[in-house]
Curated annotation (Swiss-Prot):
Protein name as annotated: Bublin coiled-coil protein
Pfam families: UPF0184
Keywords: Cell junction, Coiled coil, Cytoplasm, Cytoskeleton
Region (Disordered): 1-23, 67-108
Localization per record: Cell junction; Cytoplasm, Cytoskeleton
Name of the gene encoding the protein in the UniProt record: bbln
Coiled-coil ranges from the UniProt annotation: 25-73
One GO BP annotation of this record: intermediate filament bundle assembly
GO molecular function: molecular adaptor activity
Length: 108
């Protein structure tokens, strides 16, 4: 007869397989306590992650609003003012910020 894992000539009656738990109630309580502590740490980590994620979204929205305001100020300049300053719209960032705003709005 083969054993439980396909091992040849091993049977339960041989005494090699012991299904009795050697753990007492104290060991189970210690394991449960450790698992509760790990669960608590994971909950705390999840709360911190959620908080940081919220702050990141606020920062990204603030940055997007600042770029929109900056772009609006640039569009209020006449071409004569831009050439007098020696800077063009392309030198100040062009449409790269707009593309980033579009990606943020789309959620990518």
């Amino acid at each position: 007869m083969s054993g439980p894992n396909g091992d040849p000539n091993i049977s339960v009656e041989d005494g090699l397989i012991n299904d009795d738990d050697d753990f007492g109630s104290e060991e189970y309580e210690a394991i449960n306590s450790m698992l509760d502590q790990i669960n608590s740490y994971l909950d705390d980590l999840e709360e911190r992650n959620d908080s940081l994620n919220g702050k990141l979204h606020e920062l990204m929205e603030s940055n997007r609003q600042a770029r929109l305001e900056f772009r609006a100020q640039l569009s209020n300049h006449t071409p004569q003012e831009d050439s007098a300053d020696g800077e063009s719209k392309e030198e100040l960032g062009g449409d790269a910020g707009w593309e980033n705003d579009k990606k943020i709005d789309e959620g990518s």
